[in-house]
Amino acid sequence: MEIDFMRILATIINFIILILILKHFFWDKIKRAIDARQEAIDETILKADEDAEKARRLRLDNERILKSAKEEGRKLREEQKKEADRIYKEIVDDAHREAEAIINRANIEIQREEEKVKYELKQQVVDISVMLSEKALGESIDESKHRELINDFIEKVGI
């Protein structure tokens, strides 16, 4: 096989002419398409970087908000516990005061009843003494004077 230099030279010239024609008619369009594609890729990368930064900021904000919410929840829980403890103590103290008041009223009532019973007993003793005296003496004596004597006697005895 023999090499034909003329044919090679003609092919090279044809190729150069083809490239010049393609460059003249299509190079600007191809360059614009490549540049547009490169610009779109750069914008996509820039947008992805911006979105990543925005996501990072949002994550940090969310973590800060979550931490703040947890702290606020803890404080609120502590305040509610303190309030519940205060109310519990207040209820217990009120119950103690009310129980003491009931006991005091009961003691006063018991003392009144005791005084009433003593008075009634004293009256019955006086009545019985007057009856016995009348029966023993066989006559009626001045009842008011007799009651006064019996009351003095009962006072001295301590009934």
From Swiss-Prot:
One of its GO terms (molecular function) is proton-transporting ATP synthase activity, rotational mechanism. Disulfide bonds: none annotated. The keyword Nucleus does not apply. GO terms for cellular component: plasma membrane; proton-transporting ATP synthase complex. SUPFAM superfamilies: F1F0 ATP synthase subunit B, membrane domain. Its main location: membrane. Pfam families: ATP-synt_B. It is a single-pass membrane protein. It comes from the Bacteria. It is found in: Cell membrane. The chain crosses the membrane at residues 8-28. Keywords: ATP synthesis, Cell membrane, CF(0), Hydrogen ion transport, Ion transport, Membrane, Transmembrane, Transmembrane helix, Transport. PANTHER family: ATP SYNTHASE SUBUNIT B (PTHR33445:SF1), ATP SYNTHASE SUBUNIT B', CHLOROPLASTIC (PTHR33445). F(1)F(0) ATP synthase produces ATP from ADP in the presence of a proton or sodium gradient. F-type ATPases consist of two structural domains, F(1) containing the extramembraneous catalytic core and F(0) containing the membrane proton channel, linked together by a central stalk and a peripheral stalk. During catalysis, ATP synthesis in the catalytic domain of F(1) is coupled via a rotary mechanism of the central stalk subunits to proton translocation. Belongs to the ATPase B chain family. F-type ATPases have 2 components, F(1) - the catalytic core - and F(0) - the membrane proton channel. F(1) has five subunits: alpha(3), beta(3), gamma(1), delta(1), epsilon(1). F(0) has three main subunits: a(1), b(2) and c(10-14). The alpha and beta chains form an alternating ring which encloses part of the gamma chain. F(1) is attached to F(0) by a central stalk formed by the gamma and epsilon chains, while a peripheral stalk is formed by the delta and b chains. This is ATP synthase subunit b. It comes from Clostridium perfringens (strain 13 / Type A).
